[in-house]
Design a protein with these regions (language model features):
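Short glycine/proline-enriched turns and hinge-like loops at secondary-structure junctions
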Residues: 80-82, 99-102, 157-160, 177-181, ...
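N-terminal Sec-pathway targeting helices
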Residues: 1-16
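Extended amphipathic, helix-rich lipid-handling scaffolds
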Residues: 41, 87, 106-172, 192, ...
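Solvent-exposed loop/turn segments connecting transmembrane beta-strands
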Residues: 30, 61-63, 79, 174-180, ...
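Short, cysteine-centered beta-strand-loop-beta hairpins and adjacent loop/turn segments enriched
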Residues: 73-81, 174-177, 296, 344
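Hydrophobic residues on conserved beta-strands that form the core of alpha/beta folds
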Residues: 50-54, 68-70, 84, 103, ...
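Terminal hydrophobic membrane-targeting helix
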Residues: 19-115, 135-142, 146-152
Length: 353
């Protein structure tokens, strides 16, 4: 009798392990939740429809819950199709028995989607004219990433949502002729990010002839404004036309210069608040870095030339460290390096307000 019970429990144990293994790694195909999932999704927004071929139920032994995996999921937003690579719904174990659709969280992933899919999503809440402009900004590139969306017991979306993803090999056509090329950026959003905001870290990309790798942009979205903190790493060649375009954004004047060109490696902090109607306020900036070679050709002052015949309107710098920052209404510049005097370079140090 003892051997019989031992064999019985061994068989039950092996059977239980086999079922757990099957449900964890292979899954059980079912249509138990199909209609309910579609109706719940379509109730969320009148212009959003969820479509999928079938569902598979998996056991999640780590959290002791069920995972409903939708097969070949896609979202239709105002008849615009967005293909998803994954849409997993996490439910309590009792949901399979009671048919109560008590959603705990959802994981939504997409892989190698066209960057223009962004404007399909933003079209739900942005005015049509603004969304058209946004669609023009995103010229080309791919998207990949994953949303994790928690749900409260009453079915509402929880606060601890998050997103992690990438923009890959994109071209971003910004206003005033600013074209960012070959942009690859990591994007993270959620409670684990500083102040619960969004952080974009540029891994590669270029603006004009400047490389932007290792630049970081932090956004904190509030009710009526967006707080933007950025650290822009620019490395490469610069020209006078580029200087004028960038200076216009910072409110700097270039009237006294005839030409500027050089090669730099700079880190620039730019912080500001973007208010209603995209109005910029509380702008502050600071720059540090190294200048390998820099030529500044200023407008020649005849009065100075008259009394200082050796005066040269062209300034040539090399191997120079620069620090520039604004303090209230003052702009402070510090330079320390080599400056060309006649046919040779001399060391110099300047601090100017």
């Amino acid at each position: 009798m003892g051997k019989f019970f031992l064999r019985f429990f061994v068989i039950i144990f092996i059977l239980a392990i086999s079922i757990i293994f099957f449900l964890s790694y292979i899954g059980l195909e079912t249509n138990k939740f199909n209609d309910l999932i579609k109706s719940k999704a379509n109730e969320a927004h009148q212009h959003v429809k969820l479509e999928f071929k079938k569902t598979k139920i998996h056991l999640n032994p780590k959290e002791l819950n069920l995972v409903v995996k939708l097969q070949k999921p896609k979202v239709l937003i105002k008849n615009n199709e967005i293909i998803l690579s994954k849409l997993d719904l996490f439910l309590p174990l009792r949901s399979f028995i009671t048919s109560d659709f008590l959603l705990k969280r959802a994981q939504i992933a997409f892989f190698e989607n066209n960057i223009k899919d962004l404007s399909k999503i933003t079209g739900l809440f942005l005015p049509k004219i603004i969304n058209k402009q946004l669609n023009k900004i995103f010229k080309e590139g791919n998207l990949e990433g994953e949303f994790v969306i928690p749900f409260e017991p009453d079915g509402s979306i929880g606060k601890d949502y998050g997103f992690s993803g990438k923009v890959i090999d994109a071209s971003i056509d910004l206003p005033k002729g600013f074209l960012i090329k070959n942009l690859t950026t990591e994007i993270n959003l959620g409670k684990e990010i500083e102040n619960g905001g969004l952080v974009a870290t540029i891994r590669k990309g270029s603006l004009f002839d400047l490389q932007l790798a290792d630049s970081i942009i932090n956004l904190k979205l509030k009710k009526d404004e967006t707080i933007i903190k950025s650290l822009l790493h620019t490395n490469g060649k610069i020209s006078f036309s580029q200087i004028k375009e960038i200076s216009s954004l910072l409110g700097l004047k270039t009237n006294s210069f005839k030409d500027i060109n050089g090669k730099v490696d700079l880190k620039t902090k730019i912080n500001f608040i973007l208010g209603k109607k995209f109005k910029i306020k509380n702008l502050s900036y600071a720059m540090t870095g190294d200048i390998a070679h820099f030529v500044i050709d200023t407008e020649e002052k005849k009065i100075i030339k008259k009394y200082l015949p050796e005066y040269n309107s062209k300034v040539v710098l090399k191997n120079t460290n620069i620090k520039l920052f604004n303090s209230e209404s003052d702009l402070i510049t510090e330079l320390n390096g080599l400056i060309k005097v006649k046919d040779h370079f001399d060391s110099f140090k300047v601090k100017k307000k």
